[in-house]
Amino acid sequence: MKSRLQAFKQFTRFVSCKSCGVELQSKNPSVTGYYKPPRAVRKDAGTIEDLKYLMFTQELQLKKHEIGLLDPDTDPDYKEPIPKRLVCKRCVDAISHNRYNSSDFPIHSFNDIKGALPHAANVYHVVSLSDFPLSLDKTILAEKNNRNYLLLSKADQITYKSSMLPHKGSAFFAEFCRRHIGVHVKKVVLFSNPRNWNIPSVINALAKRCYLLGNPNVGKTSLINSLLHEKSTSFQAQLDKRGNVIGPPKGHEQIQSTRRRAIFNEGGVSHIPNFTRTMQTYLIEDKVVNDLPGYTMDPTKVSDLANYIEKETLDNIRKTSKFKIDKLIKQNYTSLTGSKTGKCLSFGGIFHLVPPNSTINQVVNYIPLPEHEFSNVEKAVSLSLEVLQSENHSLRQFFALKKPFTDIKMFDRHVIPPFNGAIEIVLKDIGYFQVKPTGKYGFNGLYELWVPKGIRVCIREPLSKLISKSYEKYIESGDIADVCPTDRPLISDTYIMNHTEEDTFARMREMYINRTSKDILSRRLLQKDPNDIVGTLQSPPSNLYWYYKW
């Protein structure tokens, strides 16, 4: 039996699934790669009228082509079927019918896929901006044997201005990697697949032979499909044992329409994580691009969201098409006032934001989840079980959490370090929302987010504003150091505390000292009275106790 690692080392020609890349077989439905061979279709002769019309349209196409008027991509008279390519049953069920089991999409570790990487490879680490930096793997960017690049996807989920991507965004994140993470990357490119933003910049950044590497659902295969549509001569290929390109696939060259040709070569894209099962190779112009399966940084700690959230709601969270860019433009918010009883704002009954007493907050939710206020977290969680047991409950639309996460014991209490102005709260593989206190500044306590155990959470300064303001400062000073602030941490983990902890501020100091015990140089502001720091509005923000473990 071949190990997964050995499977990724194979560079032999075989009939593979167009969508996931797995080797196909038609003998055993219970074995990986099963597909149903297409049936031979007998064409009816048709009526005389049908034949006359067919001859007329074919003659019309031929005449237009002869005089240079026929454009296969735009002419309505051009009729061209796309040749069929074989797809395994798993992918057909998932893509066409949204019918799947999570067990059919196993998790890959980095060790599972690293066998496909040659020594001294051109590695393009694809990272989602939606949950940045939780899908960024420092070990990939720190590998000195490789030439490392950073491709930041889903840029349309942090800004509605594509003009920010090529210069401001790239400069900011290049300096961010160097100064905050301690790694040097050869190039940074921000892009958006759904809106086709900055795709030419990605092509220009690609080396002659490169490898796309990243977590599941960060947009690697979607990027491949964008590249195929951008460059009409591109196609899906295979590699022989020596690494030479074999291709294009049968049927490619007979397609005249560039758009249809790109569709013919597209890889399978789905909101389901771990969809790609083996390395898939593409020739983009004269560049060999290898799309590797998404991998999980620490499979022992991964939490399958399918075990937490109802299927329909989870599908909506994962589908990039559900993100509404209007929210970035209009900034429509929910007003939330803190109370002594711990009033909370619940997001789909999945996680709950608790602001300090007497604070007035604007919450902008960029996650496709309904919001609802409850008197406290205990009330919200206890109601979730009641709601799930009654299909006709009046609050049914506000709850999507599965058992056993309908018990407060299954939740972690994430305490958020102090902040000035707005922050973005980020949840791994889910997205982010923004919290902005309003009115006269005053420190009334710490914010909390109650989340089912196992879901990673962090906070960050609002990315779009941070990038724009920093670039403006850089233009004024001419000092590249100003393109990304280094006077404070810009990202932080949260502090998970006991449900009964009362003095969260003092406990946070203890936890901060413990977290930084092996990173003394990252410690800040410990010589000052913390109450003095949070007692006054700081500009720029002090970000007391902010610390992120890369």
UniProtKB/Swiss-Prot annotation:
It is found in: Mitochondrion. CDD domains: YqeH. Signal peptide: none annotated. The keyword Nucleotide-binding does not apply. GO terms for cellular component: mitochondrion. Residues 1-43 form a transit peptide. Residues 107-298 form the CP-type G domain. Keywords: Mitochondrion, Transit peptide. One of its GO terms (molecular function) is GTP binding. It comes from the Eukaryota. InterPro entries: G_CP_dom, Mito_lipid_metab_GTPase, P-loop_NTPase. The keyword Transit peptide applies. May be involved in the mitochondrial lipid metabolism. Belongs to the TRAFAC class YlqF/YawG GTPase family. GEP3 subfamily. PANTHER family: GENETIC INTERACTOR OF PROHIBITINS 3, MITOCHONDRIAL. This is Genetic interactor of prohibitins 3, mitochondrial. The gene is GEP3.
